[in-house]
Every structure is written in C-alpha cells, then in structure tokens.
Regions:
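Conserved N-terminal catalytic core of the sugar/cofactor nucleotidyltransferase
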Residues: 1-6, 33-109, 113-117, 121-124
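N-terminal nucleotide-binding beta1-loop-alpha1 segment
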Residues: 1-20
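Conserved alpha/beta core of the MobA/IspD/sugar-nucleotide pyrophosphorylase nucleotidyltransferase superfamily
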Residues: 2, 174-276
Length: 463
C-alpha cells in the first residue's frame, strides 16, 4: 500500500461565486460539508500529519476542521494570494515541526465527491514511477474554469495553464488540472520557495511549482477513472448539478441492492443512510443522517426522515420524523410530525395531523388523528381519541404524562401534566384530566351543556 506522510488540505478560499456569507468549504453537500468530505477521504489514508490551510473566516473554518480531525495542524495563510502561497505556508509550518518528509498529498477542499480510492490510486502511481510530483487530471466535456493540462508530443506534462492565462488553442484542451497533487517533500519544499506572482492574477500559483519539480525529476500524470469524484464546485449551479448526479448514483446503488426507489429524480438519500432489501421508497422522499429503513417498510410519498430507525413493515406517508424509532408494522401519517425523541412500538399508529415529541408509544396503541403527545408514555393497546392534547409545559418545566394499557381516551381530552392515567380507564369526550386516575375507572369532566333558545348573534341584534 502506498505510504502517505503528509497531507495539505487547501481551505483558504472565500468562494465569491457562491455569493454567501458562509465559506465555500463549509457549504453542505448531502449532509456533510465540503471540507468534512475531503478530510474524511484524506484521513482514511492515515497520513502521519494533516495540515489544513485557512484564511477567509479563518477561525470558523479552523473550528470545523478541528471538529473533523482534532489532530489536524491548522495553518493560517497571510494576505499573499494564491494556492502556491497556501502550500508555502503549510510547508513552512510542517518544517518547523520537523514533520515534513516523504510523500505529500495536496488536495483542494471544494471537491465534495473526492474519494479515498482515487487518492490511493494517485499515490500508487506516484510511488510506482518514483515521480518528483504527480498531477491528478480529468477530461471534462465542459472544462471552463479549470487549468488546462498541456502535454508534449510524447504525452508528458509540459505545463498547466490557468483559464485566465490560456490562449485560444489552450482553451480547447479538455484535460484539466483537478488541483490534487502528490509531491516528494524535498521537491515541494524547493519548488514553493521559488514561486513568484508574475501572472495575470498577481498570485502565487501552485502549478508553477511543477516547473521546478520537472527540473529535479519526472512529473507524472494520473487521470482520474471517475470524473465525478474530482469535479469542483464554484457556484450554486454547479453544486446543484453535482448533487443531482451524485444522488442518482446513490439511488441506483440502493436499487441494485434490492431496494425499490420509484423515482430517483425526486428521492434524496444521504450517504450514511442504510436501507434493507425489499424496502420501498416513494417519490418526494428525503432520507437524511443516520436513518435506517428495514425490509418491507414503505416510505413516502413526500416524507422526510432524519436520524430515524424504521423497522420491518412500517409505513410512513407524507410525514416528517427526526431522531425517532418506528416499530415493526407501525403506521405513520399522513401529515404526522414526529419531533426528536420518540419511540413507537410494533403495530402502533400516529395518524393524520398528529404531533409527538419525546413520546413512548407501546405496542398496539393508536393515536389516529389531530392530537399532540409530548413528554408522555402510553402503554400497550390504548386508543387516543381525536383532538387530544398532553399539556406538558407549565411555563417553566416540561412535565410527564403516563397513560396505562387498554385505555380509551375520549375525543377532545386535555391531560394536564404531570398526570397518570391507570390501566383499563375510559375517559369521556371533552374531559380535562388534571389529577391521577386509578386503574379500571371512568373519568369525565362535569361540563354542563347550556342552551339559549331564540339566540341571535350580535351582528343580527344590531340590525
């Protein structure tokens, strides 16, 4: 296996074309930031040292980088512009730490699909040919914005020309620089020490370091086997296009594993989601975070699940659930909102316009419609009538409601927590339950009906 001694991740850019007050590298891509994705791919190669270069909103980016890898060396780029200067700063810092030798990987952090396998292949090619440096390239149908790879007649790298410095013939070249390189550490140290800003942008270009590398040894080229993995994101149009292409791949991957995805164009599945064979995902579904869907479950249409476990045979229709567990054969929806912290047991129901938060619903219990259940435990085989509310908040504390098994809660009940309702209880419609109810009881509020005959509303009386 190819050895990686140092990795330098470039995360200094503002990303002005994103037109955002969020640094480009901290934008989300299918549940993770660009920077997180790149750092995860690099960290899987187990470099001895990993440096992250920051500049725009430096502390914000540095804080994110440390959260992804607490051992990362944070390097702040000064006011001198360019990727070459960014690498200079990293090299100087690593040299001060006496940690700069062997093979160095340089990676831009605006390629959210850059994968460990591609980086490993680059390092293997670099090592196999004993190169001074190796450039990762790709051939794109639309190379706009990328530096062009200019080869000599023998196919070797002649130079890399940035878009704004390229002439008409060079702009026709479709092989591009991906801004990913492998360098010998000593070669890189020499190369970056001689960089200048003699170009149209007045910046230190890292690509100029390859000229020095060519004087020392061979500069190789490794073409990426997967163009999608090395596509960068410069604006939100590119972000949307890359997200769509990635998501189609994800959906197709699950379909090949035995999952039915009715419409991949309208189904979004993040990378950490797990789905078992024979699950069915209907259009308009968004599966996020650590969501896991078991066999024979049916999700959708128009459903969002975030960090939610769906057990075998459960059905979730036109609903949203977050940080919840839905038991075997549970039926959720339509228009159910499960806020964080719910556990619904086997064959339970949370029906139309039901909201739950930190609720435990035991096997066979049903909350069919128009109810709020929060900070509550409802035991097995209980039915909760429509329009029922657990009034859990007293203005300071969230209080608990306990409802026993085989209970029939009437329509329009309000349970004022903290309160406990025992087993086998029946409550009358419209009851306000403020005090504990023992087992095997009937409870109802004495709300007398008053009828005023020949009544006229105010607007009628004023005529």
């Amino acid at each position: 296996m190819a050895r990686l001694d140092c990795a330098i991740i470039l995360a200094a850019g503002e990303g002005t074309r994103m037109k955002s007050d969020t640094p480009k590298v901290l934008h989300d891509f299918a549940g993770k930031t660009f920077l997180r994705r790149v750092m995860d791919s690099v960290s899987a190669l187990h470099p001895r040292n990993e440096a992250v270069v920051v500049k725009y909103q430096a502390e914000r980016v540095a804080q994110a980088a440390r959260s992804y890898n607490s051992d990362a060396v944070i390097v702040e780029q000064d006011e001198i512009a360019g990727t070459g200067r960014a690498v200079q700063c990293a090299v100087f810092e690593l040299e001060k730490l006496n940690e700069f030798h062997g093979t160095v990987l340089i990676v831009a952090s605006d390629m959210p699909l850059l994968d460990t396998a591609t980086l490993h292949q680059l390092l293997e090619a670099h090592e196999a040919h004993n190169n001074a440096a190796t450039v990762l390239t790709a051939t794109l149908q639309d190379p706009f914005g990328y530096g062009r790879i200019i080869r000599d007649p023998q196919g070797n790298l002649l130079r890399i020309v940035e878009q704004k410095d390229a002439n008409a013939s060079e702009l026709l070249v479709t092989e591009v620089n991906t801004s990913v390189y492998a360098f010998d550490a000593e070669v890189l140290s020499q190369a970056v020490s001689g960089l200048s800003a003699d170009n149209a942008q007045g910046e230190f270009y890292l690509t100029d370091a390859l000229e020095t590398a060519r004087e020392i040894g061979h500069v190789g080229i490794f073409q990426s086997p997967d163009n999608l993995s090395v596509e960068g994101v410069n604006d939100r149009v590119q972000l949307a296009a890359l997200l769509k292409a990635h998501n189609i791949r994800v959906c197709e991957g699950w379909m090949r594993e035995g999952v039915t995805v009715i419409d991949p164009q309208t189904t979004w599945i993040e990378d950490d989601v797990k789905i078992s064979p024979d699950a069915v995902i209907l259009p308009g579904t968004y599966l996020k975070g650590s969501t896991a869907v078991s066999s024979h479950a049916v999700i959708g249409p128009d459903t969002t699940l975030i960090n939610t476990q769906v057990d075998e045979g459960a059905v979730v229709e036109r609903s949203r659930a977050e940080d919840s567990r839905l038991g075997e054969g549970a039926v959720i929806g339509p228009w159910t909102y499960l806020r964080p912290g719910n556990t619904l047991g086997p064959h339970t129901k949370a029906g139309a316009y039901v909201e739950m938060k930190k609720a435990v619903i035991d096997e066979g219990t049903k909350v069919p419609h128009l109810s709020y259940v929060g900070d509550a435990h409802i035991h097995e085989n209980t039915n909760v009538g429509g329009g029922t509310i657990t009034a859990n908040y007293d203005g300071v504390h969230k209080n608990h409601t306990e409802i026993g098994s085989h209970v029939h809660i009437g329509a329009g009940n309000m349970l004022v927590a903290p309160v406990t309702v025992g087993d086998n209880v029946t409550s009358g419609a419209g009851s306000v339950i403020r005090h504990d109810v023992p087992d095997d009881a009937m409870v109802y509020s004495e709300n007398s009906q008053h009828t005023v005959e020949q009544w006229k509303p105010a607007w009628e009386r004023e005529k």
